[in-house]
Every structure is written in C-alpha cells, then in structure tokens.
Regions:
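N-terminal lobe/hinge region of extracytoplasmic solute-binding protein
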Residues: 47-98, 129, 222-223
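A structural "hinge/loop" feature
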Residues: 48-67, 90, 117, 139, ...
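Aromatic- and charge-enriched surface segment that lines or borders ligand/interaction sites
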Residues: 93-147, 178, 262-265, 308
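Surface-exposed binding/hinge segments that line
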Residues: 106, 139-204
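Gly/Pro-rich hinge or "lid" segments in bacterial periplasmic/extracellular proteins
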Residues: 174-176, 183-249, 257
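Append "and occasionally in soluble cytosolic enzymes with long acidic Gly/Pro-rich linkers
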Residues: 228, 236, 310-407, 493, ...
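Ligand-site clamp/hinge motif
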Residues: 235-281, 294
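Detector for C-terminal structural segments
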Residues: 321-349, 393-402, 427-539
Length: 539
C-alpha cells in the first residue's frame, strides 16, 4: 500500500503530534511556534521504511522486527557498541568443556522481565526449547514462507531433526544453563548475538501463540530490555522506556520523500534508508547523514524451477547483462561497491576461485543465443509499498536492471509485489510461481561467514529452486570444523560454487545510512543494526 502524506500525518496525530503541513502562507515563525503536547516532547520519533512484522524475533527474518526486538529484549550474549565483539548481556560468563561438546552459561542474578517473571535457568531452557521447535509452532507451509530461521542455521536443524547439533539444554542450577552438542558448534558465541536469540518471558507467550495461528502477530512479549512494547496496532509502533528515559515512536513510512518531509517538518527526529536521490537535499539542509559500514548484501535471486532459468547459459547471460558497477555508481551511496560473492570482505576475503561477471552486452547476447532463448517471458519481481535498509527505492533498482536485461535480449515482464504483512517475502519463499528473477537482500547480524551462506544456500528452497549436495555437505562440515584455516577454505569453496552455478547474483555491498535532525546530538549507528535507542542523545 502506498503511504501518502495524509497517512503519515494521521500516524503522527495518533501519537499526539501536531502535523505541520507546509502551505504557501506558512512561515518559519509558524513552524517554530507550533506547540507539541508535553507528553510527546520526550518521545523520540524514528522513520523506518517498513513496519515490523512481529514482536517475536525468532519467527521471522524481518529486519524491522529485529531492529525493535533489540530494544525490548536482551540476549545471553551481546555486541560491544564500539568494537562489535561479543560481550556479556544476560549471561555473565560462559565456559566450554575441553571437548567442546558442552557450554555452561552463568546468568545474571536479580533480573526481572517486564511482566514480573524472574530470569532463571529454567526460563532460558524454555526459550531454547521454543526456538528449537519453531518449525512445529509455524507449521511446514509458513516455515517455508519465512525462509530459514536462525536456530536452524546455527545448529543445523530443529530439535526434532537428525541434523540438529544441539541435543539437550538443562538447568544445572538456578542460574546456570548447560547446552550439550553432538559435535562442537563453531562461532556459537557470535551466533547467539543474533536478535532471534532474545530471551522473553514464557508467561507472555500464550496470547502471542494463539494469534500466531492467523499470521505473524504484533502481540507484545515481555523482555528485560530498556523498553517495553507500547501500541503496535497502527503504522506507528510505540516503545515505552522502563527507566525514565525517552519513549520512542517508530513510524513506518515506505516513501523516501515522505520520510524526508517528516524530518523537514520536525515530525521525525531520525529516518533510516537514505538514498542518493535525496542526499544533496539533506546536506544542503544541514542534516547529519550517518553511514553504517557495509555489512549487508543486495542480490538478484534466480528461480531455477523456471524452465528458462534452468539453463546455465541463461543465468550467465543475466550476470553479464547487469553492469553492476554503473548501478552502484548511480543508485547507491558512495562507498558501496559491487559484490562478486555473498560475504563482504570484512567477513571473508574473495578467493581467486570465485567467478566474476563483468558487464558485457555482446557476451550476454551470445550466451542467450547459445541457450536457444526465444523471447519467452521472464517475470522479474520487486517489492512495493516498502523499502529495506539494504534496498532503497526498489522501483528504480528494478528499472535499471530490467533495462539492462532488455538490452541484452530478455523479454522482461515486471511483477511488482506488495511488501505488506510480509507478502513479498512469503510469495518469493513460498508457493511455486512463474517468477524467474527477484530482488532481495540480507542484513548481516552474525560476524561469521558461515551464517549467510547456510541461511540462503545450505538447504533446498523455493526462493532459488536450487539443490547442490556438495554445498550442503561442505556447509554442514564447516559448522563443526575447528581448524579456522580449513573452515575458511571450505567457505571459499562454497562461494566459488555459487558463483559458478548462479542460484543468485550478488549485486552490491551497500552503504546504508540514516539522516538525523538538527536536535539530535548522538545516534548509536551499528552495521548489525544493534542501535540501542536508550543511548540516543538530544542537543
């Protein structure tokens, strides 16, 4: 659904914020004299490109859900705001056994959830059991529609599956939890920083689980973080401070220019997903543009279940037709760069074995001819009604890429699909269709190169219609490989295999950025989106 300025203003009014509508007669003094209710003065207002899909970060791969979950819940292991290294959060200490088959986590004492429940080892055990059985909670069809979830990625499968490396989670004492594995799980501590491993109160699950039968709900769960859920019913989600800090209102504003309008009229303090299209306006207005380090990937997915896309020459023609360097130069923020593999170099350096595809129109045309392509329609899907942090203005991205593909001889059929309620994600991941190509991407939360590759490519899925038994085997081995050099080589081999077989084409490692208003002194930017709102400072 397109969010008009009227919708934006209605959302602001629901917060008690006075809409500032620019007119020909409006003056600067009028704007400055606009009164705002005292209760709203302490509310920090953030514009984001889409609304969160759920209040439970364990049941979805949605970026906006995870962004807000970090404010309400805490993990056992956290991320240092300055270095990105792992730090104690709800677990004060952790110890592996000599053989790596057990992990003991010691919990903080005297921690209480927002609903009054005490943090104990039994509570943590219940959380692990919930994460490990989310496949049963969602059911097969919906599980397929949300993509591979973090518990399965980290442990190799769910608790009822043979591939799962986690065999038991027990409360060894009131504040010690012990995990037992069939083999040592590498990078486990880093993986537990993923927002999907947030600890919530089991006493708050019942209403959520009931609502889950009808879709991903926004029913509040109780955490231990600096915020609790406020109103989640509209396009604005409220976060209420638990320690007398500022409350936060997170407004879903899909349109880039409407987010800019919100900043200009002081209805927003910050907005995310800045695009080059408005960069000059931001700079000329004196706003601060806060850039994150590139730790996300935008890619073009290829559905090999589509009869035309089954031909490798066709997929190679797609790769050569794109001219990704020009796309980055014109549609991405400065500092973004072309991706030739899925992991950014800060996680995994590209090896010489990775096949690269330079823009080459003649090569693309010749490959199509060799494949016997005869103008069959190629459905190209892209999301509407929302943007992603890693994918601003998807319509423009689609137009550029579709133009390049058409020039190479493809018969491109545009297929805009609404993002609303996760429709785009569920349709791309779910039932078979005539989809040939689609735009998607990932924000990287776990600083381990295995994670992204395992999430996307370890298991056969309907997003790519691709199965590679060798890749599956190598990723499973890398999950438990203790020699870091050997493990790195394994993951380089997987990246090389993907570059040859082309289930998807990495487009760019984009610089993502926020814009902050004149009253913002400090905003805690983070490449993994661990941006703690309680640390925000006003001038």
């Amino acid at each position: 659904m397109h969010l008009s300025r009227r919708t934006l203003l209605a959302g602001l009014a629901s917060l008690g914020l006075a809409p500032l509508v620019p007119t020909a007669a409006a003056s600067q003094s009028t704007v400055q004299s606009q009164s705002v209710p005292e209760t709203a003065a302490r509310t920090f207002r953030i514009g984001v490109p889409a609304k969160a899909l759920s209040t439970d970060p364990a049941v979805t791969n949605d970026v906006e859900t995870h962004r807000l979950a970090r404010q309400v819940y805490q993990n056992l292991i956290g991320v240092d705001a300055e270095t990105g290294e792992t730090v104690a959060e709800l677990a004060t200490d952790w110890t592996f056994s000599d053989d790596g088959l057990q992990l003991a986590l010691e919990l903080k004492h005297d921690v209480t959830f927002h609903d009054g429940t005490k943090l104990t080892a039994d509570v943590v055990v219940e959380n692990f059991e919930r994460w490990g059985s989310v496949n049963e909670l969602l059911g097969e069809q919906r599980l397929r529609q949300v993509g591979r979830l973090p518990f399965s990625v980290v442990f190799g499968g769910y608790l009822d599956q043979e591939a799962c490396l986690l065999t038991s989670v027990v409360a060894s004492s009131e504040h010690i939890v012990t995990l037992t594995f069939t083999e040592p799980v590498q990078a486990l501590i880093r993986s537990l920083t993923h927002p999907a491993f947030a600890i919530s109160s089991p006493e708050s699950w019942a209403e959520f689980d009931t609502a889950l039968q009808d879709g991903l709900p926004l029913v509040p769960l109780a955490g231990t973080g600096p915020y609790r859920w406020g109103d989640t019913s509209g396009e604005t989600i409220g976060l209420e401070s638990t320690n007398d800090g500022h409350d936060v209102a997170v407004l879903a504003i899909p349109n880039l220019h409407e987010r800019l309008y919100g900043l200009d009229t002081q209805q927003l303090d910050v907005f995310d997903a800045v695009s080059p299209a408005i960069l000059r306006q931001l700079v000329q207005s004196g706003y601060q543009v806060l850039q994150r380090d590139p730790l996300a990937v935008l890619y073009l997915g290829i559905n090999q279940a589509h009869p035309v896309m089954q031909n490798l020459h066709v997929r190679q023609a797609v790769a050569h037709a794109l001219f990704r360097g020009e796309m980055v130069d014109t549609l991405q923020l400065a500092g973004s760069y072309v991706a030739h593999q899925f992991n950014p170099p800060s996680l995994l350096e590209r090896s010489e074995e990775v096949t690269t595809y330079s823009g080459d129109l003649n090569r693309a045309t010749n490959l199509l001819a060799a494949a016997g392509y005869d103008g069959e329609p190629i459905e190209f899907w892209y999301p509407t009604g929302a943007e992603r942090v890693y994918m601003t203005q998807p319509q423009k991205l689609f137009s550029y890429l579709a133009g390049r593909l058409t020039a190479a001889g493809f018969n491109i059929v545009a297929k805009p699909v609404s993002w609303d309620n996760g429709d785009y994600m569920s349709q791309v991941m779910g039932d078979p269709s005539d989809r040939a190509l689609h735009l998607f991407g990932r924000n990287v939360y776990v600083r381990d190169p295995l994670y992204l590759l395992a999430e996307l490519f370890e298991q056969p899925n309907r997003e790519f219609g691709w199965r590679n038994n060798a890749v599956t085997k190598v990723l499973a081995q890398a999950r438990v490989e203790e020699d870091s050099d050997v493990r790195t080589t394994m993951l380089e081999q997987v990246e090389a295999a993907i570059s040859l077989d082309l289930p998807a084409i990495p487009l760019t490692f984009p610089i993502t950025a926020l814009a902050s208003g004149h009253d913002v002194e400090f905003y805690p930017i983070s490449p993994v989106l661990d941006e703690q709102y309680e640390r925000i400072q006003r001038r």
